[in-house]
Amino acid sequence: MNLIILGSGSPLPDPNRAGPATLVRTASGDLLFDCGRGVLMRAAAAGSAAGAVRTLFLTHLHSDHTTDLNDIITMRWATSFAPNQLEVVGPVGTTALVEATETMLATDIGYRLTHHDDLTWSPASVVTEVESGVVMDVGGVLVTAAPTDHAPVRPTVGFRIDEGGRAVVVAGDTVPCAGLDDLCVGADVLVHTVVRRDLIEGIGLPRLLDVLDYHSSVEDAARTAARAGVDTLVLTHMVPAPSPGTEQEWLDLAAAHFSGEVVLAEDLTTLDLPRP
């Protein structure tokens, strides 16, 4: 199993960080978790593409995690030479999002169907809405979902990917909660979105302060990793993004609560998880 952070950014546009997206490469295909802005550009850099994604998993329906859904649908369809339906797995509401996106694309779809004689089918994604439990079991790859807590955004889910004795958890946006704790037990890697409470409180803008009550701080994520006994904590979706020279501050905040390896993600940060 191979883990690639395609996008380590947040809702705030950043010239160096694409929007939230994590690629897990397995023997059964590429699994994409969330699809923030620029995801296919980063996927190309990682040697993947829309057509290579077996399944797209959405942790929740905030715009920064779904911005490039339209690009994935379009590029998968327009670059395939036979019907190649996109599988999308996400919380309740995902069906409405995908249907609305495909409706929005109707004009462009019509243009391409008219222009390309060999393109005789329209994109038609297959959506599965989930709350908890096993959501995929194919070729030795097991994906499990559990509810997380990003209230007032409801519902939200985290995902665990197991293959060959190794396990990765993609938390999405959440505060510490029992669902995430259960998902993480015995995992090798936890990919967790985080904010810097101290910096946000120092800035003091009301709209920015609002993010504190539904995101985990660096310390929160570290404590979650410690409770579960994971080996590696990957910090991503960092708000505000680390400025040059401050990276060690983030690592130190996590290390105060977690004794394992801490990785401060950048776009295309890669972790290899060979079979034990």
Residues covered by each model-derived region:
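Cap/insert and terminal regions of metallo-dependent hydrolase folds
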Residues: 158, 167, 175-268
